[in-house]
């Protein structure tokens, strides 16, 4: 692909090859043009490409005789008015012409185009035109008829012996709204009255003799191919200029420019069977070459004209409608630095045609063209497939060559090309609804005192922490925050079950008081949650009977100080959204006192057995102590909820069974919850303080930020090396971050802009470089289209990262946390992007192994950085390859699938290979469920029969294994290894990498990624560790025994659950599990630990050895949930009365159950008046269900509400309800299955339509006082005996 100065040419040739036959212009044609029939007018409107307004008109014959100043014509300045004006004028002129030349006699007579143009011009300027009429029809030739006396009849013509001089009439006309705007069409000086003169003669030799004696310093132009109206030369007027910012060009150059662009456009459109009016549209320089230098625009346009005639094409397509902006940019490229890289150079007296040019103009025209046999272009012939402009920047993937430069040289070029400082759009750190975490009271948990609960961080009100919270809040994309939080809290609160009755504490139709209601919400004069709540539009939250509002700022309630006693009345549910910061500010003693007062107000306003929610801005031990002493003894259950919307320590406390005596306490579950809660806050607070401020100006100094460079008129000719170094420098600064390019016109120049983001990760990769690897610019060079720019955005993913990206970030965090300075790393399944280079210290040598070729450069690194292209499951390759730590993320499952191996076989082969390595630590992501197997809809489907994972988003499936099998394979190879199943911490510490790399996170994606991690965990194997021996499987609630050999009596063992210390053998009385004992057997030199756990999950063990308490990893163990098997035993005789049928449910008592119904693919909690769970006198679980005719048309399930995800462990269909045989000899209950209209038929006859407008039940039906429909909002009817069926309408 060649360049002509700054103009890039395509790598193929194309040229028109068929020319249409010349057709004479007749009187009929002339009269038709004067008619100006719609669609056939002799003009074309031109529009501003931004406003779409008509701003100019292109004129065709016979309107090309307008040679006077525009005021002489009296044209309106608005196109619609001009068009009406001109049509009326032309119609009058037509009648004058036909009066002299009746169409019946002169129909096919040839018209002199010169005279036709002059006639129309004279008529429109109200000048004498009758003397021209006798010359309208050609007598001899167009030229000869006007030589001599004819030339004196108009200012249009002038005779010079055998040469006729014709004033070039306007080809364009400006409307009054033409302003030479960037988006206006260019007019190439042809809207001016005297932009050029044309000289006509029968032969070119006569014209040459004429110009021997005349000044030709302006440059004489010629059309050799089918010159319009006869042989002629064009002499542009040097005094007429046209603007193409930053250049001013004369009329001669404007004519050259327009004609060569027309030819370039014709070349792209050329097809073998498509004729054109003229094979060569270009003007060529016939005289005056001695007056133009090679740096002049005239000369360079002459070169481009020669190239266009020979079939060259512009790599950058010419838009269908030119604009001043585009033209200015093109002229700037023509005038930019560079050289003519083609073999063609213009000659003054003829046009060279290369031997292999596709143009046939030399055969069609016998004058002016010479084909040179020795001149060859060596290019293929093919029309360029032009691409339309792209409305936004496009990602660019750099590719590297073996060439290198100094890193400092790259920094220098970046500093010259950078567009910093700039103010980017900030974007959103986090998007989506609340990411909710919760814990509720569990009597099986260990009792914990308020003094043992974690304390609010002492630094919470420090200035830098306030900055971090403020930044997160500003960059958190969300609607009404109160609405999002309230909705999340209500959804969790309404799922709470009273274990004594099996019913929810919160039910439909309860009276509600809303404390802290505000009229200051956008678009509403009350909290936004109230309307959807009362209308039953919040999934899983039934509507209350009423909501009364109290607070300082209410509009639909009572103004009151909620911290003092007031006559509130009693409510079954009190929801308090009162902020303690309003009165308490940052004084914890004042805010804690307010919490106590507000808790008292909630208790006083809640009716016996009711519930309340209380927002706590600052959960201190003082607050927990007050609740422990005053609230817990007077409620039957509680829940803590954190709807994570913005980063703060705010929590919601939910109390159930108010004013009922109990012995509730805080539990270890609350302790673990609060540890995660405070760690989560501190993690995100620390990250936020490292991010640039909201609305910042990026000057390159922040660790995270925008990098942007621009190249003007990037011809990649003389500036190739400098441009490459600058682009390569930017790539070094941003590493693997996404790079976007735009190519557009700016102030007359064509600009290539590359935008990306720097981060601590990219800084680590750059610090590894010794030399700067140079990119291959070809993928940028071939870009001929316009790619429009946009303002850079720091966090630019408006929808947030996908679950798979979040999952990858979790793995990246584990890898970066495991590798320290100087560790030698062996990374398997590296991938072409080699992300590992951004995760590990720049001082750590690394060997990257992948079956795919790397996209990374080689030979440019400070420390050993090796890329091996091979199958790491093959034998023999690892000899001599050093690696202290082996990492393998998101690879082994794919490798096993690619080789049609089971996961066990692939893992065993990997272990076999690694036994010959020098590795101490293995960090491997494995396909292995660590929890109850459940499909993650849309992301992970699990085939338990064939042990396969299927990933629907990628159309890929992989094998999986189980934890015991993988541990056995490891211990067979390394008997003394310790194995840790790296747990996913809910404190979100992994988000540090994501947010500092400007990755927008989504609540929904984070939640799905957390679920996927349970099936795709990271397995850490410390080959030379000290193993612990687990006695059997560890089950929640059962005694678990652990033997740890090889340690001394003074050594201490710590056990961690997520981020929190579960217990330490140094003080087993402070353990956060229900029971733990630790004994040391001096004879055997081993420790024995007996434990009882109340929470399922992964626990990790660490030994603190010796007087220095050196930490040693012992691995981890998994505490499983109890067996999830469940059966429902129905009695032989079903009870269809209101007493209901008792169904024996066999399930582990660990699980709490609720009945659900699936409606339109959505889960809904079933009416607790229909399904009730309770313990029988013998201690077994019983489900009482009241039967309804509608049950046969619904899908009911028993689901557990044990985990963070409802139904995660148990999802058991109640299939019998769909097949029950209804009796016909007793009264039955009947409800509508859903909100649609249903036809009720008895013995096949329709008797009524449920849910129909104005529905009135049959007279022999009664309404049940308390509905037993699945939905409390649908009534239940008592119907007489019969054979009933329901049909949806």
From Swiss-Prot:
One GO CC annotation: viral outer capsid
InterPro entries registered for this protein in UniProt: Ig-like_fold, Reovirus_L2, Reovirus_L2_4th, Reovirus_L2_6th, Reovirus_L2_7th, Reovirus_L2_8th, Reovirus_L2_GTase, Reovirus_L2_MT1
Gene3D superfamilies the UniProt entry points to: Immunoglobulins (2.60.40.10), Reovirus components (3.90.1810.10), Reovirus core (3.40.50.10760), Vaccinia Virus protein VP39 (3.40.50.150)
EC number(s) reported in the record: 2.7.7.50, 2.1.1.56
Positions of the record's site feature: Involved in formation of the phosphoamide bond: 190
Pfam families referenced in this protein's UniProt entry, alphabetically: Reovirus_L2_4th (PF21062), Reovirus_L2_6th (PF21060), Reovirus_L2_7th (PF21061), Reovirus_L2_8th (PF06016), Reovirus_L2_GTase (PF21063), Reovirus_L2_MT1 (PF21065), Reovirus_L2_MT2 (PF21066), Reovirus_L2_N (PF21064)
Cell location: Virion
Major localization listed first in the record, in broad terms: virion
Keyword field contains ATP-binding: yes
Catalytic activity: a 5'-end diphospho-ribonucleoside in mRNA + GTP + H(+) = a 5'-end (5'-triphosphoguanosine)-ribonucleoside in mRNA + diphosphate; a 5'-end (5'-triphosphoguanosine)-ribonucleoside in mRNA + S-adenosyl-L-methionine = a 5'-end (N(7)-methyl 5'-triphosphoguanosine)-ribonucleoside in mRNA + S-adenosyl-L-homocysteine
Keyword Nucleotide-binding: yes
Keyword annotations of the record: ATP-binding, Capsid protein, GTP-binding, Methyltransferase, mRNA capping, mRNA processing, Multifunctional enzyme, Nucleotide-binding, Nucleotidyltransferase, Outer capsid protein, S-adenosyl-L-methionine, Transferase, Virion
Binding site for ATP: 893-900
GO molecular function, one term: ATP binding
Family (UniProt): Belongs to the orthoreovirus lambda-2 protein family.
Functional summary from the UniProt entry: Outer capsid protein involved in mRNA capping. Catalyzes the last 3 enzymatic activities for formation of the 5' cap structure on the viral plus-strand transcripts, namely the RNA guanylyltransferase, RNA-7N- and RNA-2'O-methyltransferase activities.
Oligomeric form and interacting partners: Interacts with protein mu-NS; in viral inclusions.
Protein name per its UniProtKB record: Outer capsid protein lambda-2
